[in-house]
């Protein structure tokens, strides 16, 4: 019997609701941050933010519909 695991890809978000920036970070930064949320891999994308692959569904990712970046808490 096989087990199906749901995974998603997307931009990591910080506590402030903004995409996790990587412009001034070392090359391995995004891959390390993605693995912290059990993602399989990640890189610094053209928007200069960390993009992760194969993260579990519970991991928070940036979504334009629910964007809270810069809106305060």
Curated annotation (Swiss-Prot):
- What Pfam families does the record point to? Toxin_3
Matching entries from SUPFAM superfamilies are given as:
Scorpion toxin-like
Q: Which residues carry this modification: Lysine amide?
A: 71
State the superkingdom.
Eukaryota
Q: Which tissues carry this protein?
A: Expressed by the venom gland.
Which SMART domains does the record associate with it?
Answer: Knot1
| Alphabetical UniProt keywords | Amidation, Disulfide bond, Ion channel impairing toxin, Neurotoxin, Secreted, Signal, Toxin, Voltage-gated sodium channel impairing toxin
Q: What subcellular compartments does it reside in?
A: Secreted
Where would I find the LCN-type CS-alpha/beta domain in this sequence?
8-70
Q: Which GO terms describe its molecular function?
A: sodium channel inhibitor activity; toxin activity
Keyword set includes Disulfide bond: yes
Q: What biological-process terms (Gene Ontology) are attached?
A: defense response
Which cysteines link up through disulfide bonds?
18-69, 22-44, 30-50, 34-52
List, alphabetically, the InterPro entries matched. LCN-type_CS_alpha_beta_dom (IPR044062), Scorpion_toxin-like (IPR003614), Scorpion_toxin-like_sf (IPR036574), Scorpion_toxinL (IPR018218), Scorpion_toxinL/defensin (IPR002061)
A Gene Ontology cellular component where this protein is annotated is: extracellular region
Signal peptide range:
1-7
Per the record, the major location class is: secreted
The protein's job, in short, is: Beta toxins bind voltage-independently at site-4 of sodium channels (Nav) and shift the voltage of activation toward more negative potentials thereby affecting sodium channel activation and promoting spontaneous and repetitive firing.
Into which family does the record put it? Answer: Belongs to the long (4 C-C) scorpion toxin superfamily. Sodium channel inhibitor family. Beta subfamily.
Q: What else is known?
A: Negative results: does not affect the cardiac Nav1.5/SCN5A, the peripheral nerve channel Nav1.7/SCN9A, and the voltage-dependent potassium channel Kv1.5/KCNA5.
Domain description: Has the structural arrangement of an alpha-helix connected to antiparallel beta-sheets by disulfide bonds (CS-alpha/beta).
Under which name does UniProt file this protein?
Toxin Td9
Gene source species: Tityus discrepans
Taxonomy, top ranks, is: Eukaryota, Metazoa, Ecdysozoa, Arthropoda, Chelicerata
